[in-house]
């Protein structure tokens, strides 16, 4: 799943000890500035490789785990976009046959991306343009409220929540999806970066002509970490809830994603700067 919107709802706090009364910060202005920097995040993130740990658990009606699996991927950059190569499955390394299969898949993808560079560049430009419009619309469609201030990774962050404006007509699909959630976001005060989001779905979200439907109560969290004291990159993602496929199959699941071992990417002749990270 691409991490696109860590844009939901933030909280905020008042800057504390001053003898004079300080004007309340403008929550909407904080959100707009953070949203405007999202594209910088994509630009910076594709300069790093990392390890992605993913655990998926299937649940029964009572919430008990019925099946669990884990995958570890090495994420590198091919032609400006991330590529995930499986290196571990269910706690064990790949055997020679499995490793060779993964390498063939990677080689095939390198060849494919090399052929489709111009097409992928246009698709990425459109995707980023659509996201800019969606973010601008979300900033307008929500009444943002400062709720406090917290310290994340030793740094002060505004905590901001939001309530959709009654009667506001939304155009973009991403904006419509996010207004079906309730939650908050944390904005780093110094960098104006969105560094954490927490949201719960409060209305059914449908994708693909209603074939895939996320049910109310689905819970998402996402956190960032500061790497090399200069760029914010994903640290942890978690989700839990129920989804239905084609109105027939029900999936109850929990997924935990952790990101580690960030390293500055060393480009080679196959790399073309073009796309946002996963």
Predicted features by range, described:
Residues 1-2:
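N-terminal secretory signal peptides that target proteins for export/translocation
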Residues 5-15:
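Bacterial N-terminal signal peptides
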Residues 19-182, 189-196, 200-218, 223-236, ...:
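Structured extracytoplasmic
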């Amino acid at each position: 799943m691409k991490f696109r919107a860590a844009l939901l709802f933030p909280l905020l706090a008042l800057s504390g000890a001053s003898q004079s009364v300080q004007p309340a910060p403008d929550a909407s202005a904080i959100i707009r500035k953070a949203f405007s920097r999202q594209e910088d995040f994509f630009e910076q993130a594709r300069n790093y490789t990392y390890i992605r740990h993913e655990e998926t658990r299937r649940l029964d009606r009572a919430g008990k785990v019925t099946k669990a699996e884990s995958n570890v991927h090495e994420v590198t950059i091919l032609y400006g976009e991330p590529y995930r190569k499986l290196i571990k499955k269910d706690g064990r390394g790949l055997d020679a046959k499995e490793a060779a299969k993964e390498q063939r898949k990677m080689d095939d993808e390198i060849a494919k991306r090399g052929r489709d560079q111009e097409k992928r560049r246009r698709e990425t430009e459109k995707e980023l343009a659509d996201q800019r419009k969606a973010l601008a619309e979300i900033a307008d469609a929500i009444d943002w409220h400062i709720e406090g201030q917290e310290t994340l990774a030793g740094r002060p962050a505004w905590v901001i929540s939001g309530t959709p404006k009654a009667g506001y007509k939304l155009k973009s699909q991403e904006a419509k999806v996010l207004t079906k959630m309730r939650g908050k976001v944390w904005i780093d005060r110094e960098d104006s970066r969105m560094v954490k989001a927490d949201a719960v779905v409060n209305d059914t979200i449908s994708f693909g002509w209603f074939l895939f439907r996320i049910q109310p109560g689905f819970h998402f969290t996402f956190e960032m970490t500061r790497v090399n004291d200069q760029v914010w990159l994903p640290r942890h993602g978690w989700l839990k809830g129920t989804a239905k496929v084609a109105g027939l199959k029900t999936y109850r699941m929990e997924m935990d994603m952790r990101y580690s071992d960030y390293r500055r990417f060393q480009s080679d002749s196959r790399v073309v700067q073009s796309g946002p990270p996963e």
